C-alpha cells in the first residue's frame, strides 16, 4: 500500500504528523481519493501524497520529501530579541556534528494564535512579540500534543514562561518538556545544570511517566557531582525533595 520508505517505526509518527498538518477532514478525503483511484492498480508513495495534496490544496509531496529524503530531524529554537520572536531550525545532533544545511517543512503546532502553522525556511522572524503575547494566554509552546517529529528549544524569557506554568500542564506536555531538555543537554546545546530548574518545578508530580523521566535525569546527574562539594549537598537535597512527595503519597 505505502512506499517501503515509511513502513517502519518512524513512519507512523510521520503519518500522524501529516494528518494533523492537513486536518482530519482533508486527510480522510485524501485517503478516499487515493483508494478509489488505485483500487485496481499498483501504487507508489507519491500517489498517496498526490491524493492528499488534491484533497487539502497543500504541497504534501514537498512536506513528506523533507522528512523522508534526508536523514535526521530538526531542533526548532525560539527566542525573543528586540521584541521580535525568532524561530529557527537546524539539524539536531548528539555527538559529532556534520552540518549539511538541511531544512524541513516543520509544522509548528503552536498553542498561540498569530503564529504561522508551518516553518519552511531556516529562520522566521515575527515582529511585535509583546503584542502577540498580550493577545494570547499562557506560555508560548510549539509541537503541542507532541505529534511532530522535532525538538523544541525555548530560550530566555520563553523558557522562563514555560517553567512558570510547568507544574500546571498536562502530563504529556510535562513529559515533552523534560525529554526535550534532556536531549538538548545530551547534545551539548544546553548544560546539564540547566535541567535543575525543570526538576525543581516537578517535585510534586504524580504521573508515573513524568516521575520516571525525571528520576532517570537525576540518576544521570550523579555522574557530574563531585563528593564533598556544595553541589553534592544541593543535589542530595533536590533528590530528597523530589522523592519525598511520592513516598508520602504512597
Positions of PLM-derived features:
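Non-catalytic accessory/interaction domains
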Residues: 1-6, 11-17, 24-28, 36-250
